[in-house]
């Protein structure tokens, strides 16, 4: 009981920063101004169609809403500057946009304060390293070698918009703010697909709809909060058979207290969720749950997650969305890498005096490779090659200068190598580089109405240097020009970078136009 209350208080402690009543005052501009961490420029809100609104406009609009004459004029003159007229195109594209984005700025303030409260400056680089996407792969490499089963999860969706508001009620104590949130959700009823479709959730980031992104992150945060709580409580069940019954009663009492807040959810005992080695990772609406337990234990966790979504989020989760695989016999797609834990057999001959014998050693290794087919499909969708991987020119870029074309192709190639530097096999990456290099040459040749061979002879080594990665440039400085050096063997080792904070656009085809 005390442990649960202490765990909940850590989450509730953030409520002291929630100042939502200020949303209905003109002082919102001061908070939004400080939120931008820039004392000279106000916060810019990027809305639909790439329109930018200053937070100063939010302040002026809220002041205007408080003016009684404005509301009277809106009623007496419905065709003149009516705020709540949904048929008014200017309202749809401007007033509602800056109000919803301004609301999102305010509700993000408590979360930003938590992130900015770093204890010391010397710990900031370490915190930034943990933000890197590549930082999770060394963790998987260290932990997955000792695990047996892997579950592929999908965050429950679609989620009803009213449930999103109810989830925020536990954190937001300001009733008018919740009413305003419901107003935005009702107005954006045609945006319902942004929450109810995972494909649209990725497009949500592209549209930069801050309000809906905040709602989705809050929903996922609540989902993981209860999952983490139950995982931590299950660790106390590692007892012998003689003491299981007493601990089971003690644990059920905790669940009864927990059921006061959410009645009707924990009606079944969950004493069988005993797994001290369980790891959870999530990205893009998907998650993986790995453990060292038996297959029966994983099936029970699967049943629990299905009931969890049904009782708490009022969502019927199909059991097919949770797949259970054995780590040594399968591979999984994670953040653009095809990862697996194969068992490598090593035969060692041991000589002892006059006797010799062979030792068969089996070792696990966390392996990451680059999937060729999805990346070639992304390049094909971006019009760099055909569906079979044959390079083609990109006519849209022929109006650019030669150096701009070279820079764009070279930057895409270097970013691909940089992001997939952790692959144990670089053959796919060199194939992608060949596609981009030849596509660049054909684009330049098409612009100058020349042949590819003629244009490559004209540029010479300058054309090739644009496609060198940072590692290849270092290796090229170590050898003279007369030395024949192959870069294919220099990248046999995997390299993880701690400065990658976003996934490559070509890795996620949904981000491409």
Curated annotation (Swiss-Prot):
Keywords from UniProt, A to Z, are: Chloroplast, mRNA processing, Plastid, RNA-binding, tRNA processing
Concerning InterPro entries, the annotation shows: Domain_X, Maturase_MatK, Maturase_MatK_N
- Enumerate the subcellular locations listed in this protein's record, separating them with semicolons: Plastid, Chloroplast
Look up the domain of life of the source. Answer: Eukaryota
Q: Which residues form the signal peptide?
A: none
Coiled-coil features, chain-numbered ranges: none
Q: Name one GO molecular function term.
A: RNA binding
This protein's major location comes to plastid
Cross-referenced Pfam families: Intron_maturas2, MatK_N
GO biological processes: mRNA processing; RNA splicing; tRNA processing
The family note in this entry says: Belongs to the intron maturase 2 family. MatK subfamily.
HAMAP family listed in its UniProt record: MatK
The record's section on PANTHER family has:
MATURASE K
**Which function does this protein serve?**
Usually encoded in the trnK tRNA gene intron. Probably assists in splicing its own and other chloroplast group II introns.
Q: What is this protein called?
A: Maturase K
Q: Which organism is it from?
A: Phragmites australis
């Amino acid at each position: 009981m005390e442990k649960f209350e202490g765990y909940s208080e850590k989450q509730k402690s953030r409520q002291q920063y929630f100042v939502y009543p200020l949303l209905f005052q003109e002082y919102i501009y001061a908070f939004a101004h400080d939120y931008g961490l820039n004392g000279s420029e106000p916060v810019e809100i990027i809305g639909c169609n790439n329109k930018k609104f200053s937070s100063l406009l939010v302040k002026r609009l809220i002041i205007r809403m408080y003016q009684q004459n404005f509301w009277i004029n809106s009623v007496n003159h419905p065709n003149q500057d009516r705020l709540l007229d949904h048929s008014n195109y200017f309202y749809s594209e401007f007033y509602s946009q800056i109000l919803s984005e301004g609301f999102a700025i305010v509700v993000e303030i408590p979360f930003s304060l938590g992130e900015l409260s770093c204890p010391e400056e010397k710990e900031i680089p370490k915190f930034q390293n943990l933000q890197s996407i590549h930082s999770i792969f060394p963790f998987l490499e260290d932990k997955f070698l000792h695990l047996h089963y892997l579950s592929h999860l999908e965050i429950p969706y679609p989620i009803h918009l009213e449930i999103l508001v109810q989830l925020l009620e536990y954190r937001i104590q300001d009733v008018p703010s919740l009413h305003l949130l419901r107003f935005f959700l009702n107005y954006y009823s045609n945006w319902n697909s942004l929450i109810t479709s995972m494909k649209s959730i990725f497009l949500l980031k592209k549209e930069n709809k801050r309000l809906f992104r905040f709602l989705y992150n809050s929903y996922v945060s609540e989902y993981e909060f209860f999952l983490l709580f139950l995982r931590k409580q299950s660790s106390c069940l590692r007892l012998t058979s003689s003491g299981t019954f007493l601990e089971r009663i003690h644990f059920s009492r905790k669940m009864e207290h927990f059921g006061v807040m959410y009645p009707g959810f924990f009606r079944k005992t969950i004493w069988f969720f005993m797994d001290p080695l369980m790891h959870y990772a999530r990205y893009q609406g998907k998650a993986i749950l790995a453990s060292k337990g038996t297959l029966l234990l994983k099936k029970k966790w699967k049943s629990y997650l299905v009931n969890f979504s049904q009782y708490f989020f009022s969502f019927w989760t199909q059991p097919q969305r949770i797949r259970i695989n054995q780590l040594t016999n399968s591979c999984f797609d994670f953040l653009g890498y095809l990862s697996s834990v194969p068992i490598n057999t090593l035969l060692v001959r041991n000589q002892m005096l006059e006797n010799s014998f062979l030792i068969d050693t089996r070792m696990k290794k966390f392996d990451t490779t680059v999937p060729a087919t999805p990346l070639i499909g992304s390049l094909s969708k971006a019009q760099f090659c055909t569906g079979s991987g044959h390079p083609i020119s990109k006519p849209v870029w022929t109006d650019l200068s030669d150096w701009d074309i070279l820079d764009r192709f070279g930057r895409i190639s270097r970013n691909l190598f940089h992001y997939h530097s952790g692959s144990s096999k670089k053959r796919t990456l060199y194939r992608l580089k060949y596609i981009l290099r030849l596509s660049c040459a054909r684009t330049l040749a098409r612009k100058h109405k020349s042949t590819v061979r003629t244009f490559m002879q004209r540029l010479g080594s300058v054309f090739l240097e644009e496609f060198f990665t940072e590692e290849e440039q270092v290796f090229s400085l170590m050898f003279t020009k007369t030395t024949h050096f192959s870069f294919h063997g220099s990248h046999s080792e995997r390299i993880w970078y701690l400065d990658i904070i976003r996934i490559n656009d070509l890795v996620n085809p949904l981000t491409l136009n």
